[in-house]
Amino acid sequence: MIIDSYDINSEPIVKLENFYGEKQHLVKKCMVIFSKVIYEYMLEKFPCRQIAEVRACNGNIPVWSLPYEEETIAFYLTPIGSALAAGTIAEVNHLTGASVFIMFGSCGSLDKEATDGKFILPTEAYRGEGLSYYFAEPQDYIKIKNTDKLAEFFKERKLPYVQGRVWTTDSMLRETVNLVNKRKEEGCIAVEMELAGVQAICDFY
């Protein structure tokens, strides 16, 4: 069963250094971009330069950097879905040394009254995907680190936000009435497709 997939007692057969060589240390922070519009805006408006590339047989993902105040921040356009988004973060970490990843994107609301007109800051993610079970011990939810730090940031700037559980799923086509109701009963206010896996891989590394 998938809940038996967490194995820290033996070494992985495939390692990133086999493909990319030694880990690099180029930047500390990296933005994970889902929106092609935002991605293209950043490339157009900032003096960006390519610092790395995630390689894949169906197309490579360039990783860019831009200067912001006295920092250099990396960013890239991420693939969608838990396995790809989380795996890409692991590769970007290896290629650039980035250890602080800022990820934001869209989602589906499960509670319009709570979320309408607000930024959603997840506190926990239901693990309705597969990747997280390889990187974290099996349990229904995974805690989202730094959610309270983000809430303080939003509060100081008087930005509308709400905190709550979210549901990470691998298939929006199987968000059935019964499953939606069950997640809502557990306190989920939104549904998306990446967070549980991304948090698990970040915690692991």
Task: Describe the residue ranges of each PLM region.
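Metabolite-binding pocket within alpha/beta catalytic cores that recognizes anionic/polar moieties
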Residues: M1-I144, D148-K149, F204
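Glycine-rich beta-alpha junction loops
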Residues: S35, G108, W167-S171, G197, ...
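A structural motif corresponding to the C-terminal end of an alpha-helix
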Residues: E69, F153-Y161, V198, Y205
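A generic structural signal for alpha->beta connector loops
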Residues: E70-T72, A98, K158-Q163, G187
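Short alpha-helix boundary/capping motifs
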Residues: S82, I144, L173, V191-E192
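Short, conserved beta-strand edge motifs with alternating hydrophobic and charged residues
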Residues: M103, P122, V162-T169, E192
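Active-site rim beta-loop-alpha module in soluble metabolic enzymes
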Residues: D140-E185
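A C-terminal functional module that forms or caps the active site or interfaces directly
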Residues: N178-K182, I189-Y205
